Amino acid sequence: MDFLFYFLFKLIIQSTTKMPPRDPFNSMLSLGYSMLFNEIMSNVLALGLHPYVGFMHRIAKGHPALVSDLIEEWRAPLIDSMVLAMVKRNMLTKDMFETNETGCFLNPEARKIYLQTYNKKLRSDNQYFEDKYTYRESIRQQCRKYASVIMHSDITLYEPLELR
């Protein structure tokens, strides 16, 4: 339980940090967001979409703005909820993180636990609109809906994510 209070204290006192992560909680979030980013990037590329042209994030050299746009609705239901559950269940301890001048990172043992948890979460079912899909399938479906909007110039083909 000490680990939970440590993380919640850090979460309340400090805002989330970007790269590099400076504490265990942000390290877990950062790793999850990076993995989710790659999951969405592979779907965007598989659909033949241009990952660097988005609609919410500013277009910047070398930044896949579309992927950043599409990741937003998945952060809380996937990564944030998973990390909070891991903290609540004390799945990782403070000594499973390595902190140095470049940031705070999961050690190999922690990465193994984290990756297993992440993959289990992506394989778990959720209520995606009218059907049940795994999170991985739901991400694929949402990317397809976005592609349909682009191909048919019809915004009504895309529904914002609402998981129940």
At which residue positions do the language-model features occur?
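Active-site helix-to-loop segments that bind/position phosphate- or nucleotide-bearing substrates
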Residues: M1-R164
